[in-house]
């Protein structure tokens, strides 16, 4: 499947600039392969690829919201400790869904039952930025914001026990806050960062795309 991602590439480059005071902990431009340190949860090798400076993942049937926890191809890596300083994670996402709740997300992820996700999702026929919190499989929507776009920047900022989600529409200069809340607190939970997508149609092949992934330590 071919993608025409000129605006997407510009979006990824547009929010890659950072303050000189901030520390780049990790970045991945998906230049021909995945960067070091990523692992897959329920990997299906035929349903992901790295191409053209981006990670493309098939949006397959399955779910991660609530009790089902059968979504495939969750890409995860350890998150920096945010107890003593803010951590910021960002990525550019393109998603062209046709199926109810079909979505592509950036998440602060502990396990399948504990996370905060921020993504581009189709809800009742409308493209939306959706932010949601899940703890012990109990879910709560923190934001659902209609947006007429299939490509967007997503950003999570975590400090202490709080998390905030922002989004950056293509062509915009300033991030827009989507929502905020408390992090879930799983017993002995170790925070990870995840890129994932799910709730795709069973009878069509849809692919979401991620680019320009960054983890920063924010200097206050």
Give a label for each model feature.
Residues 21-40:
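Extracellular carbohydrate-recognition regions
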Residues 30, 89-91, 152-180:
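Carbohydrate-binding surfaces in secreted/extracellular proteins
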Residues 132-153:
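Short, aromatic/His-centered strand-loop micro-motif at the edge of beta-sheets
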Residues 49-69:
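Short carbohydrate-recognition loop motifs
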